[in-house]
Amino acid sequence: MMNIRVRRTATLVMLLLAALPAFARNAAAPQQPIAVQMYTLRNAGSLDQQLKIVHDAGVRAVETVGTQNVSAQALKQLLDRYAIKAVSSHVPLTELRNNLDGVVAFNRAIGNTTLVVPYLDQKDRPTDAAGWTALGQDLGRIARQLRGKGMQLAYHNHDFELADFEGRTGLELLFAAAGPELQTELDLAWVARAGLDPAAMLGKFSGRLFAVHAKDNAPKGQAEDEGGFAAVGQGVLDWNAILPAAAAANVKWYIVEHDQPRDPGKVIQTGADYLREHLTLSQPARARR
C-alpha cells in the first residue's frame, strides 16, 4: 500500500512539474498594449456583462466613459473581478473645468492616471486659428494642474479639429499652444474621414501620443447602419502603414473602438485579435524588450 501511495505521489509531482513551464510561459507572457473604449459596449447589457466581454476577448485594459454611472468603489470591484485595469477615462471638458478635484479623486480610486477630453460641444468648438490657440492654452493649464496631482491630460479628436487654418489644422494649433504636458489620443478613423493620412498624422504628434483609437472605416456606402465604421482591419484604412508609423511615434496604447457596432462583442474580439497579430509583426523592437 505504501509503495502504491509513493508511486501515485511521484506521478502527481511529475505531472505538476511538466505543467509548470507552460504555466510559467503563460503567466510571464506580457500583455500587449491593447485596451477597449467602453463606449463601444454601452448597449451590451450591464456593466458587469460589458467587462466580461472585454475579459473574454483577452483584453485586460479599458478606457472608461466618465464614472460609468457607478461609484468608484463599485467600478473598482468590477474591474478587479475581471482582472482589468482602467488606463484612461473620457471626461467632459465642463467637468475638468468645474470639478477637477472630484474627477481626480474618482480616478485615483479606480487606479487611473490619464484623463481624456473626448469631444467638444458645438458651443465650445473654435471657428478660427485664434480660437484653437486659446483652447490649447486652456487645456495646457489644466494639463499642468493634473501633472501636479500625478495625472496627465490627453485630447481625443473627431474630424472638425482637422479643418485647415492657413496650413495648420486646428488640432496642430491646439497642441502647439498647450505645451508639452498635453498628450494626444489620435482617432485614426476620424483622421481618415477628414481626408488626411493617419500614418502621416501620427508622425506629426510623435512623442505625444498617449494612445490611438484603433477603429476602421467601411467602404463608402457600406455598413450604414453602423455609422460607416468597421472592425479594425476589416475596412479601408491602411494598417500596414499605420502600425509601423504608430510604433515609430511611440504610441503607448491601442484602444479598440467602434461608434455604432451591430455586434459589440464581435467587433472587440476581431479588433483585439487583429492588433495582437499585427502589433507583433510591425513592432519587432518592442517585442524584443
What are these regions (language model features)?
Residues 36-40, 64-66, 88-93, 117-119, ...:
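A cross-domain feature marking catalytic cores of carbohydrate-active enzymes
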Residues 148-236:
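Acidic/histidine-rich catalytic cores of soluble enzymes
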